[in-house]
Amino acid sequence: MLASYASDPLKSRGRLYKELPTSYRNEFERDRDRIIHTNAFRRLQYKTQVFINHEGDHYRNRLTHSLEVSTVARSVANTLNLSSDLAETIALAHDLGHTPFGHAGERALNECMKEYNGFSHNAQSLKILTLLEKRYAAYNGVNLTWEVLEGIVKHNGPITDEINEYIAEYNKQNDLELSTYASAEAQIAALADDISYISHDLEDSIGAKIIDFNSLAELKYIDQHVFEIKTKFKNISSSCLIYEVVRKLIHELITDLLWQTKENLNKEKITNIDEIRNLNYQIVDFTEKTNERIKETKKFLHERVYKSNKITAISLKCTKIVQGLFKVYMDDINLLPVNWKMLIDSNETYSKARIIADYIAGMTDRFAIQEYNQLCSLNFNNI
């Protein structure tokens, strides 16, 4: 049974374009299925999490990451008697707006767009789901419920300063109450993302030999897990050891999140969802000690993994590809596919840049590489 402060699909604020309900799925389940059927969701399979897609079959990509986030979000929401369908749906959609090549690609595209109000993957997720996906005759986008769209836009908290242009524009026709917190389910999705990415980036980085177990000693709480597991299993292999460490880490983080969130709910005597939205802090959270550990782990990953020679070298190449494609298309829109070129008023530089950014952001890693080789390479074999 859902808690009184849960997002009840029967009490949804509805969709921008009214639709009749179905008898066999609730509104949030319908949204989950719509997201899974989008082209943008399928493309996540070929978009970078940390390692470029073709570097290895077992490294995570944006799709596997999104699926892992959704399982954590669903488990946490279920335990707290919240809507697991809503938490899962927001988690599945949270990375739809990412560019090819992960954060390196986003930084590169944002730099290209600095004269045109920049680029944000969060705003791009909203744009994909409300405009760019063309699956219905009656409207653009996939017409998701208010609760899902609110959760995607505000899962990291209220938006009050420097509101992204597209978010502000969309908000005029469908008020997402940007100055308040999102539902507890959306907050769960955001922290499920943290749990998944720090755990699995550690795992993938050890698998790629960017870091080793000796370097994990910098993170004392994780080093303690390593010690306990090696003490229990004397002859454990390195590959199995990292799986055990990650499993223990995820369990520890979820347990901590559940405990602190229950404490917050009891302390605030929360009885309805509006009280969650109007609080001056997010109700779903870790303990202070765990928040410090997460901050420490993110710093470790940033310094030892994301800034490593291997990742930096790849990031430089990815930056060159994104910026090269942007310049080529800006110089000659005839190089764009016909359906994209038709959207552009060639006399208006701003709208041209935004449409080109939408096109590049939707590319997979391999398609971006292929396009770059075709359009920017001096190798005549590519022509």
Swiss-Prot record:
SMART domains documented for this protein: HDc
Gene3D superfamilies: Hypothetical protein af1432
Coiled coil: none
Pfam families noted in UniProt: HD, HD_assoc
Hydrolase among keywords: yes
Keyword Hydrolase part of the UniProt annotation: yes
Cross-referenced PROSITE patterns: HD
Stated family: Belongs to the dGTPase family. Type 2 subfamily.
Protein name: Deoxyguanosinetriphosphate triphosphohydrolase-like protein
Protein species of origin: Rickettsia felis (strain ATCC VR-1525 / URRWXCal2)
Lineage of source species: Bacteria, Pseudomonadati, Pseudomonadota, Alphaproteobacteria, Rickettsiales
